[in-house]
Amino acid sequence: SSHRRQRQMCIRDSLNILAAMLGIVGISMLIPTLIAYFNSEPNIRGYVLSIVICLSLSIPIWLITRKSRKLTSKDGFALVTFAWLIVAFAGSLPFYLTESIPNFTDAWFESMSGVTTTGATIIGNTQTLPNLLNGIESLPKGILFWRSFLQWIGGMGIILFTIAILPLLGVGGVQLFKAEVPGPVADKIRPRVKETAKVLWLVYIGFTAIQTLLLGLAGMPWFEAVCHSFTTMPTGGFSTQNESIAAYS
């Protein structure tokens, strides 16, 4: 029937967008991989495997479902839900596969806390993670960066992140935006959703860069300045120190 065919098209379009998001998260893992490489960290294989898993899942699905059509509001709500779950799953892979957090449930918790900017952490519990006797400070730099980066992309909302890439996929982002920001506000922004997303991201990146510069000039090591800017800008709260910002007082 035409209704069943329409639903299949919507599922196809949703899978296309989710696959694109998974692929972008996978590509972004190149940054902590390079950090780990230049710091001669022993766990680079875990990052590479994480990238391979994300891209091997996302690229075939994206290619198969490439023909895009118009999404409904119902699809938008479903996408919001699955976007958080998929990005949190992808984000947990470097924690788990580098054995920084050897329990997958704990890795999932840490990742979900990051992308939702909740700020709760499993790290520091020596009973659960006896391999991290010094808590957060036991983590390698690549993982410290990845924790911070997850909060940073979560800070603007996964949906705004999606809106930014939707024009590349030929799909409108209004349904996703309405699912994240319901009511008259979404309707007002509706005609300029693409431009709004661009401006918000530019402001977000700009403030992050300014904060990094100020922290660095104030004496904080540049790597830690970047990580703290990535976590304070979205009000997430992750830190590279057990005592958080108090460690610098």
What is each residue range found by the language model?
Residues 1-7, 11:
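Single conserved hydrophobic/aromatic residue that forms the stacking wall/gate
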Residues 57-66, 158-193, 205, 222-229:
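Juxtamembrane interface elements at the cytosolic ends of transmembrane helices
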Residues 23, 27, 82, 86-90, ...:
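Hydrophobic alpha-helical transmembrane segments of multipass membrane transporters and ion channels
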Residues 32-45, 64-69:
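Short, hydrophobic transmembrane alpha-helix segments
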Residues 71-82:
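Cytoplasmic-side transmembrane-helix entry/capping segments in multi-pass membrane proteins
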Residues 28-30, 49-65, 83-90:
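Central hydrophobic cores of alpha-helical transmembrane segments in multi-pass inner-membrane proteins
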Residues 19, 28, 90-154, 217-249:
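P-loop potassium selectivity filter motif centered on the GYG triad
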Residues 46-52, 144-165, 208, 247-249:
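Alpha-helical transmembrane segments
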